[in-house]
Regions:
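Extracytoplasmic small-molecule ligand-binding "clamshell" domains
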Residues: 22-106, 114
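Short helix-initiation/N-cap motifs at beta->coil->alpha
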Residues: 67, 82-93, 137-139, 174-188, ...
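Ligand-binding cleft/hinge of the Venus flytrap
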Residues: 54-58, 70-79, 141-146, 160-177, ...
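Hydrophobic residues within well-ordered alpha-helices
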Residues: 73, 94-96, 145, 186-187, ...
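Flexible hinge/capping segments at coil-to-helix
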Residues: 133-150
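Ligand-binding clefts/hinges and TM-proximal coupling segments of bilobed small-molecule sensing domains
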Residues: 21-27, 159-176, 213-217, 244-262
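A ligand-binding cleft/hinge motif common to bilobed small-molecule-binding domains
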Residues: 89-93, 106-115, 163-166, 187-221
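Periplasmic-binding protein-like
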Residues: 124-131, 198, 202-245, 262
Length: 262
């Protein structure tokens, strides 16, 4: 009798466990990974104004380091990459509402982390000045820049503007709407300095002879570049991180970076 009762109890416990597992699986939300594969497209939000990571050309196409990498990620999933143009002030809202990933030289910040996951960082960066080459010695430090006579220029809505407002309260600050042509303002003598990511200053000094990056190897602060991912979706995050790990380990990422920076 005892054996029969124990057997029945064991059967009931097993059945309950199976039912609980089935219910748990049914209740588990689908990962964005599955949605992307089912949809057949990977939607990437990007500003298109930040060389060498993302640039929106006159023909309506995007190019840059992050664009090539997003194409690679999409290929690994067997889908097509679809790029959604946004702006730095609207990046987070557009990403949450419209996209699977957010790319294009995005700096990791705790404020952004509140609304999204980040991938593993793929580049260490930091804020440093770019100025006319004759002025390199004049703008070496935050204190030298933060003077009423200094004309600082920044693009709106991102970490550059936040940095400038925090560290240059005494300087004359101009928020210039076009992050592509903003460097021409310095060349033309309409501004003295822009503080942006060191990687961008290195490229822009090549594109704009007469401009020089100031100590890009010793930026004012520590920064990293990573991609935005949907908050809470660890399955998708793990896939993208593994893809990124392999892209770096195999040299694919380095080859793409060299294509745009060398």
């Amino acid at each position: 009798m005892k054996k029969t009762a124990l057997a029945m109890l064991a059967t009931l416990l097993c059945a309950g466990a199976v039912h609980a597992q089935t219910a748990s699986n049914a209740a588990a939300p689908a990962s964005r990974l599955d949605e992307v594969i089912a949809r057949g497209t990977l939607r990437a939000c990007t500003t298109g104004d930040y060389k060498p990571y993302s640039f929106y050309k006159s023909d309506g196409q995007f190019e840059g380091i992050d664009i090539d990498m997003a194409e690679s990620l999409a290929h690994s999933l067997g889908v097509k990459a679809e790029f959604v143009k946004t702006s730095w002030p609207n990046l987070m809202n557009d990403f949450v509402a419209k996209c699977d990933i957010g790319i294009g030289g995005v700096s990791t910040t705790l404020e952004r982390q509140k609304r999204a996951f980040f991938t593993d960082a793929y580049m260490v960066d930091g804020k440093t000045p770019i100025v006319r080459c004759d002025d390199v010695n004049k703008f070496q430090t935050v204190e030298q820049i933060d003077q009423p006579s200094t004309r600082v220029i920044v693009n709106p809505g991102g970490t550059n503007e936040k940095f400038a407002r925090q560290f240059f309260p005494h300087a004359s600050l101009t928020v210039y709407p076009d992050n592509v042509t903003v460097f021409k303002q310095i060349l033309a003598g309409k501004a003295d300095v822009m503080v942006t990511d060191a990687s961008e200053t290195l490229l822009q000094q090549k594109l704009n002879p007469g401009l020089c990056s100031v100590h890009p190897d010793k930026p004012f602060q520590f920064g990293e570049k990573a991609w935005l991912l949907p908050r809470g979706d660890m399955v998708f995050q793990q896939y993208v991180n593994q893809w990124l790990h392999l892209a770096r380990a195999t040299g694919e990422y380095q080859a793409i970076q060299d294509k745009w920076l060398k």
